[in-house]
Amino acid sequence: MDKLLRRVRMAEGMVARRAQRKNALLKRITERKQNKKNGEAFTEAIQQRKAAVEARNEDWMLGPLAPRRELDEITLSNGNFFGSLSPTRALLESEVSEEERKARVAWCGSPKFLCIAPGDRVVVIEGHHKDLIGTIEKLNTRNMTVEIQSEKLKTNTTVPQFMQNDADKPVTQIYARLPISSVRLVHPLKDPQTGEYRDVIIRELRPRNIVHDRPTRTRSMRRFVPGENIIIPWPKQEPIKREDQPADTLRIDVDEKTFVPTLFRPPAPQQVLDELRNKYSIFRTRHTPEYIAKKEQEEQEKEAKKSAAKAMLTPVQEYNRKQRELRRARGQPALTEEMLAKIGEVVARNKLGHHQAPKVKEETVAQIEKAVEQLSLGGGQEDAATTTSPEQPKVV
């Protein structure tokens, strides 16, 4: 079974690595496409600026002889008609980073808890349409942009070639989108002095009382003005009108219980369980007892084959094995009383010898005594000849 589990782990790791490589490849492809798209929008803006500068110079130099650029001709520099933008620039479809998304909604919460919604009245605080008040028609949370319902925000856009029909015009008007950082909320508040309601620009909003409803997977929260403790109500959303169709399932059929689970029968026929569980999958970890017993028996047979080589021994190896078995059967030798007493005597004698001075051999003592006796009697000629000085005799 260990081999099966190891195989499952290896297969899972292999699939995880393959998925990781695939995701990395898809991420690189997506980033390459997005960078190309952003580069095209940036290049288009630069080309339009250059074309505007050239057109201004030509109009100033040529005067009445200046060309009429408002005719239905595509400008070769940017591929758009005169006075129109591409849909990418008009709708701000260029991908932005996470830091840019957070910066655009810094005044109204965060990308996760956004404090504005379609239906809010906002005012434009920057750009050509500054001080314009309108209602949010659409909200794009991917790029954090809003589409304001106002005729002044309509922009001429060149329709792509693949979207044009014979009867359609090559230029159409669409609502230009603005980043959320370019707008602020407008809400009527009561004036404490006059008691009248008037529109007030809300420059900062924060979420409060965030509640997550798990059964419906919805989230509700309130928004307020920090420092003023003023709760700003959410705009009323119109209910979605759904029309019944002939193919719709009736409510009575939805509420009817057609299956009651029980423990007396399996959830599916026995014949299709193997198909549902994918019996031969390499990721399978649950097996039947018969299959487990079969695999364990195969492992035991493999181990028996490995141990069969140990049975082929030479006569010397067999003799050594028998001797080891006999020694193992005898066990550890037991000490008798005499052996213990002898060990005690040896230990005591060794301890006594460590405390006394080292003994001198008897032959050495006899030689020293003889030399001292000769020196005390005056010594002989042989001893005098060997003496180097009267104060330091040499003993051989």
UniProtKB/Swiss-Prot annotation:
GO terms for biological process: translation. GO terms for molecular function: structural constituent of ribosome. It holds the Pfam family Ribosomal_uL24m-like. Residues 384-396 have a biased composition (Polar residues). InterPro entries: KOW, Rib_uL2_dom2, Ribosomal_uL24, Translation_prot_SH3-like_sf. The keyword DNA repair does not apply. It is found in: Mitochondrion. Keywords: Mitochondrion. Residues 374-396 are annotated as: Disordered. GO terms for cellular component: mitochondrion; ribosome. It comes from the Eukaryota. The keyword Kinase does not apply. Its main location: mitochondrion. Component of the mitochondrial ribosome (mitoribosome), a dedicated translation machinery responsible for the synthesis of mitochondrial genome-encoded proteins, including at least some of the essential transmembrane subunits of the mitochondrial respiratory chain. The mitoribosomes are attached to the mitochondrial inner membrane and translation products are cotranslationally integrated into the membrane. Belongs to the universal ribosomal protein uL24 family. Component of the mitochondrial large ribosomal subunit (mt-LSU). Mature N.crassa 74S mitochondrial ribosomes consist of a small (37S) and a large (54S) subunit. The 37S small subunit contains a 16S ribosomal RNA (16S mt-rRNA) and 32 different proteins. The 54S large subunit contains a 23S rRNA (23S mt-rRNA) and 42 different proteins. uL24m forms the wall of the exit tunnel. This is Large ribosomal subunit protein uL24m.
